[in-house]
């Protein structure tokens, strides 16, 4: 897969991908009680499919469970769905912003999403990816909090001004 990139842009109801706000209507009932909606992205490999990301609501739990196989992040694949009304599953630290369409153009410093290629690791420590690779996973995409626009966060950065790396199983394409 060619490397592609997306940026954090002001909210636009005509753009499918976004960070923050209420979860998509179709996944509201799938979010565990101790998780909050983070983002929904257009699946880079599947037409008309979205990837919604939900994260543990407790920062310490999220950070303490940040390596495979103990991860406090869940991915839900689904068809596009309108923004739901489930305010209690909204992450209060995030304002709603859109995620631009994917492009092969990397001329910006403010890259939010990177798809394919090699991950740009913040901490290049084998312990973060070695077990994933040993179990047949390869890098799929990353979301780097350095790519947030100025007005995305209200309080704390969900990943402590870090990044989220998603890997997929090579044999099944499970993320």
Predicted ranges, named:
Residues 1-175:
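Preference for intrinsically disordered or flexible, low-complexity segments
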